[in-house]
Amino acid sequence: MKKQRNLRSMAAQAVEQVVEQGQSLSNILPPLQQKVSDKDKALLQELCFGVLRTLSQLDWLINKLMARPMSGKQRTVHYLIMVGLYQLLYTRIPPHAALAETVEGAIAIKRPQLKGLINGVLRQFQRQQEELLAEFNTSDARYLHPSWLLKRLQKAYPEQWQSIVEANNQRPPMWLRINRTHHSRDSWLALLDEAGMKGFPHADYPDAVRLETPAPVHALPGFEDGWVTVQDASAQGCMTWLAPQNGKHILDLCAAPGGKTTHILEVAPEAQVVAVDIDEQRLSRVYDNLKRLGMKATVKQGDGRYPSQWCGEQQFDRILLDAPCSATGVIRRHPDIKWLRRDRDIPELAQLQSEILDAIWPHLKSGGTLVYATCSVLPEENSLQIKAFLQRTADAELCETGTPEQPGKQNLPGAEEGDGFFYAKLIKK
């Protein structure tokens, strides 16, 4: 039996690690969830994701409620108060229970002397909630994004930035990819219906299904047998442009965790696929995905800037380059991105993408296709990146995705649509 732990203090410490130490929530959260009961795993995730999603608001409120912010060894208390405020604002947890559990969290973080302070701040918020929220709703913090990112979105999308921000602040839909080698989408939807769940097909992506209500993967018909994979609709769109074919040599570069590798093999089961990623630890997930789906590919650890180290002089018929990026198109799935990224990261990422593109292009056969993809919405990583590449690469030609002046296809995040995603299809003359 799992030891009873204070979830509020665990959430506070996790958020602190993200914001203060720059750690990814996807690395921090799973080990913490192993320490709590199945019932509490979902609440711990809700508290962590929710606080990170609304961090600007919670920070703003604390600055209004306290004369000076907690610092030094007491900094965790600042995040514990955030967890308390989040529960009062956004959850159905009865206020008395939210207060009691949050105040008790002070003991778990070895700050019992501050229980009275935490209780006082949260009760003060309850008394002043209406006027505080009215003031907050006229402040810049109401957009729940760091100012540098807000400025970039406003510049890139003067007409659409508010809808992008709004989508980023929502809970994401759950998209699935139906394994066409096992079932047609319609036949799998019938199985889903029999299981008491409802799904909606995507109009443009033939394998994509959106669940009406997110569900645990073990509840999905045939998940363990490889009938279905969790993958956002926009990520599935890569196959539209890559058009894998049996017998072709296909490189999936920056492949981890393997969602697109396995999609290639669902579309073209007899393709010769090489999956490469720089992160050896994340490659284990590529192996896991291949195993669950009963597929085979050549998996290698390697740096996209130095392909000769892992493929020699080999050339490919198709290359999918899912480039390392700011991930600004998937903020609704990973709200920690808002606080992990910095403005200075964008030119550094654009430089890295440029180096990988230049290095891998000679490994594409004449007449071959390279699909450049990112889960970013920033032009520096997307249309401007491809425009510059086309200008310096004489044998590269844009195909089907945009124009030389505005290259690529940019998806923006939407409530019933996929994540923010960019694709450019390039042909080697």
UniProtKB/Swiss-Prot annotation:
Location of the active site: C375
Entry keyword Oxidoreductase: no
GO BP terms, alphabetized: regulation of DNA-templated transcription; rRNA base methylation
Known EC number: 2.1.1.176
InterPro entries: MeTrfase_RsmB-F_NOP2_cat, MeTrfase_RsmB-F_NOP2_dom, NusB-like_sf, NusB_RsmB_TIM44, RCMT, rRNA_ssu_MeTfrase_B, rRNA_ssu_MeTfrase_B_ent, RsmB-like_ferredoxin
Molecular function terms from GO: RNA binding; rRNA (cytosine-C5-)-methyltransferase activity
Superkingdom, taxonomy of origin: Bacteria
Keyword set, alphabetical order: Cytoplasm, Methyltransferase, RNA-binding, rRNA processing, S-adenosyl-L-methionine, Transferase
A Gene Ontology cellular-component term: cytosol
Keyword match RNA-binding: yes
A family per Pfam: Methyltr_RsmB-F
Gene3D superfamilies, per the entry: Helix hairpin bin (1.10.287.730), NusB-like (1.10.940.10), Sun protein, domain 3 (3.30.70.1170), Vaccinia Virus protein VP39 (3.40.50.150)
Top EC group: transferase
Chief location category: cytoplasm
Residues at which S-adenosyl-L-methionine binds: C254, A255, A256, P257, G258, G259, K260, D277, D303, D322
Subcellular localization: Cytoplasm
Catalyzed reactions per annotation: cytidine(967) in 16S rRNA + S-adenosyl-L-methionine = 5-methylcytidine(967) in 16S rRNA + S-adenosyl-L-homocysteine + H(+)
Function: Specifically methylates the cytosine at position 967 (m5C967) of 16S rRNA.
Protein family membership: Belongs to the class I-like SAM-binding methyltransferase superfamily. RsmB/NOP family.
Protein's recorded name: Ribosomal RNA small subunit methyltransferase B
Organism: Shigella dysenteriae serotype 1 (strain Sd197)
Classification lineage: Bacteria, Pseudomonadati, Pseudomonadota, Gammaproteobacteria, Enterobacterales
Name of the coding gene: rsmB
